[in-house]
């Protein structure tokens, strides 16, 4: 279905490619600060800090988008604001990914296949959500180097993520923290439901 999003890349590297990929997927993309400028005149390209997502939030409201996507300087971190322009904390965003990842597993999935790694900065709510969805939560020291190490040692684990906005999708992807791929996965998840106008959930209700 049609989805409108605002995309803020903070004048950093991912901008032009991210627009091209999302538009190729049929997304109605409203670009914000997606042209390259290494002086970063609008805000630092860090989508996990609320102050860097304020312009994105205002643009979502202005354009009536379902949500807004922010990317960091080198395209390995993702941040989101909801339809009200409200910042979504990365561990809550990870919960949306986790629900889809675990629901795709077979009933006889092994413990390793159900293991989700997250860093110590994430909330207990994420750990509880993983358990409720039938997953096995495993807390890891903060740092994407440590997450990559866990995925090498547990190659059947479908996902790992951090409060910094690094999300490592390891089910249909190779375990890399790629913001463009993660944005595409998020849009796929959202697109499975009817639009809010047709009775589907708003982003803030997820």
Regions from the PLM with identified roles:
Residues 1-193:
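Phosphate-binding chemistry for phosphorylated carbohydrates and sugar-nucleotides
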């Amino acid at each position: 279905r049609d989805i409108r999003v605002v995309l803020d890349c903070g004048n950093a590297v991912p901008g032009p490619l991210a627009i091209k990929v999302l538009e190729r997927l049929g997304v109605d993309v409203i670009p914000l600060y997606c042209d390259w400028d290494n002086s970063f005149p609008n805000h630092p390209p860090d989508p996990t800090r609320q102050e860097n997502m304020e312009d994105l939030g205002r643009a979502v409201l202005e354009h009536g988008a379902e949500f807004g996507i922010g990317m960091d300087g080198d395209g390995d971190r993702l941040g989101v604001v909801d339809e009200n322009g409200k910042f979504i904390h990365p561990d809550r965003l990870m919960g949306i990914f986790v629900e889809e990842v675990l629901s795709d597993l077979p009933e006889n999935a092994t413990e390793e296949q159900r293991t989700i790694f997250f860093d110590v900065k994430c909330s207990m709510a994420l750990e509880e959500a993983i358990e409720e969805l039938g997953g096995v939560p495993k807390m890891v020291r903060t740092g994407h180097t440590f997450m990559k190490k866990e995925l090498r040692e547990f190659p059947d684990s479908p996902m790992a993520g951090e409060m910094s906005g690094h999300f490592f999708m390891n089910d249909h992807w190779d375990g890399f923290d790629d913001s463009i791929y993660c944005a595409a996965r998020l849009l796929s998840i959202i697109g499975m439901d009817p639009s809010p106008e047709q009775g589907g959930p708003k982003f803030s209700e997820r």
